[in-house]
């Protein structure tokens, strides 16, 4: 086990441990200015007992703006998780390093990267899983199992074995989880509201909505913070990619494009309801006939 991993992982059985490639430090936010939004900062002081605030960082504009806003509003953040499928776009991996430097400079914890593992503790990427099973990412078939297994699952297992989270749950309280839905995405929060209220483990908050930050406001906040704009966060073989994004991948990252085509070719014999990564069309037929 890597020396950079949390000490507590030594006490977790291999079949249940989610490895982290970067440790996170606890710390309060150092910031100035007036705060008009305090959904948890006040509650942490009023309720007493154990508390922990976590952010699921996706590497895109909304979750980046969320971290910036939490800092501006002096709302403590104790843990920032990024679930790595192993197939993120290169610009996403590069932005994680940029964001880590910004977080460190602003007294916030660095990003803890987690990923799916097999029962014997080996890492399992989404790409490897698809190649082994001869299938495409489940979103190609209209499902979201790839996100559940490689994004939500690893973060949930990490929290289940993270002592500060366990301590909160043992005390009978909920872990506070900040969600980066912007002010233009009320339809998303409305759909999950009842499920959130019934969640025995997490109290979920939507700060961007309460601040009134829509997509444009998020972009402005990132610019004002002196950060470059993050690119779209997704796997390089995501069936939801638009044609121009696929062409951009082919032109700038031909090796990754070939890997996406190899996944599609590998699954071809098993495809019954879709044509390929484009769902109703094949990436190879439309964009990659000349690629071997």
Annotate each language-model stretch with its function.
Residues 1, 19-22, 237:
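Short, cysteine/histidine-rich loop/knuckle motifs that typically chelate Zn2+
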Residues 1-2, 217:
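Conserved short secondary-structure elements within globular domains
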Residues 2-6, 23-26, 244:
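Short, non-ligating residues that shape and space the ligands of small metal-coordination modules
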Residues 3-15:
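Short linker/helix segments within small regulatory modules
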Residues 15-40:
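Short metal-binding segments enriched for Cys and/or His
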Residues 44-292:
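Nucleotide-activated chemistry modules centered on ATP-dependent adenylation/adenylyltransferase
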């Amino acid at each position: 086990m890597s020396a950079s991993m949390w000490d507590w992982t030594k006490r977790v059985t291999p079949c249940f441990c989610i490895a982290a490639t970067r440790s996170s430090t606890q710390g309060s936010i150092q910031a100035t200015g007036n705060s008009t939004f305090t959904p948890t900062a006040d509650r942490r002081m009023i309720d007493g007992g154990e508390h922990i605030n976590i952010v699921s960082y996706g590497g895109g504009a909304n979750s980046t703006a969320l971290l910036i806003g939490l800092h501006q509003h002096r709302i403590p953040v104790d843990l920032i998780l990024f679930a790595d499928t192993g197939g993120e776009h290169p610009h996403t991996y590069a932005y994680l390093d940029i964001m880590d430097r910004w977080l460190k400079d602003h007294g916030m914890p660095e990003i803890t990267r987690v990923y799916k593992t097999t029962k014997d503790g080996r890492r399992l990427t989404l790409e490897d899983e698809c190649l082994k099973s001869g299938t495409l990412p489940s979103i190609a078939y209209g499902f979201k199992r790839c996100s559940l297994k490689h994004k939500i699952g690893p973060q949930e297992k990490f929290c289940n074995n993270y002592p500060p989270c366990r301590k909160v749950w043992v005390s009978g309280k909920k872990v506070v989880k900040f969600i980066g839905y912007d002010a233009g995405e009320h339809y998303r929060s409305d759909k999950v509201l009842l499920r959130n209220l019934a969640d025995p483990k997490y109290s979920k908050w939507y700060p961007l909505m309460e601040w009134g930050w829509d997509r444009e406001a998020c972009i402005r906040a990132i610019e004002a913070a002196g950060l470059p704009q993050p690119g779209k966060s997704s796997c390089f073989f995501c069936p939801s990619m638009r044609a121009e994004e696929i062409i951009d991948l082919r032109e700038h990252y031909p090796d990754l494009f070939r890997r996406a085509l190899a996944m599609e070719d590998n699954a071809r014999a098993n495809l019954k309801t879709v044509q390929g990564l484009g769902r109703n069309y094949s990436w190879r037929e439309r964009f990659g006939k000349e690629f071997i």
